[in-house]
A protein has these predicted regions:
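Beta1/beta-strand and adjacent pyrophosphate-binding region of the FAD-binding site
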Residues: 35-47
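Short hydrophobic core segments
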Residues: 44, 180-191
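N-terminal Rossmann-fold NAD(P) dinucleotide-binding loop
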Residues: 50
């Protein structure tokens, strides 16, 4: 069979040349204009850790910049998830052991009146279920009230170093490449982006041992909540086992689901994808 020639777009070729040692692209990045004056703290990533870091630094009087690649704050907690765990101890009688900024976030969510506190299916303590859009608003309100400068739709492309110290990050924005300079940088990207670009020690998932596949969940609509409440976890797992034994291809025979802040909508954690 004859091989087909594949035409690679010029934009991709340009990136490949740069990655292969062509310095032209890198020089263009280093010469990118400053997005704002020097910050005391620059945080990359606005998930729970990044937004908390930015908020804590700003409350201590630092001039803080928060960079987020999405068009909203919150990272995975607003893009995918709907429940906080870790505020309470495991067991039947949960004790609250986390406060601080976590409390501030939950208090702000409660003002929006769509918060459900519920027990974990496996006894891991109370969970705090929220509406993702409410959490987007809560984080935005809190960081702006603290005086944090927020830049959305910013993707880190590189860093500028001086004697192994990060001086600025190069970001791709809607207006093109730009630099953000700071005295201290916090990598809350979730992917160790700053570590990678700066050459700092880091671990690549799956390089030395199997990496767990990302958790894949889905939501079910039009669920009869009263009927669902009558079905306990033991019955659910038993039904899944019987279905698998009858020939239904189920990669996982246990799991859980929970009510959300929207009537008739339940979230599940019941799928499994083989690690590779």
């Amino acid at each position: 069979m004859a091989r087909r020639a594949i035409r690679i777009p010029s934009e991709i070729l340009q990136v490949l040349r740069w990655l292969n040692g062509n310095t032209t692209g890198r020089l263009a990045m280093i010469n990118a204009p400053m997005l704002a004056p020097l910050f005391d703290v620059v945080v990359v990533g606005s998930g729970s850790s990044g937004a908390s870091a930015a908020l804590a630094a700003a409350r201590e009087g630092a001039k803080v910049c928060l960079l987020e690649r999405s068009s909203f704050l919150g990272g995975t907690s607003t893009a995918v998830l709907d429940t906080f765990y870790g505020f309470y101890t495991p067991g039947v009688h949960s004790l609250k052991v986390v406060g601080g900024i976590g409390d501030d976030v939950v208090d702000r969510l409660k003002k929006l009146d769509r918060v459900v506190e519920r027990p974990n299916s496996y006894g891991a303590g109370l969970g705090i279920t929220y509406h993702p859009d409410d959490l987007k608003c809560a984080w935005e309100q809190l960081v702006l009230e603290a005086g944090v400068t927020v830049f959305l739709n910013c993707w880190v492309q590189d860093v500028q170093l001086d004697s192994d110290c990060i001086m600025s990050v190069i970001v791709a924005t809607k207006r093109g490449l730009a630099q953000v300079a700071g005295r201290t940088f916090v990598d809350a990207s979730g992917d160790a982006d700053l570590c990678f670009w700066s050459g700092s020690p880091h671990v690549t998932a799956g390089e030395h041992e199997e990496a767990q596949s990302l958790t894949t969940t889905f939501r079910m609509c039009n669920v009869d909540a009263i009927t669902r409440k009558a079905v306990d976890l033991e019955y659910l797992h038993s039904a899944m086992t019987k279905a698998a034994e009858a020939g239904y291809a189920l990669p996982r025979r246990e799991g859980s689901d929970h009510a959300t802040t929207v009537d008739g909508v339940f979230a599940t954690n019941i799928t499994r994808i083989q690690s590779f």
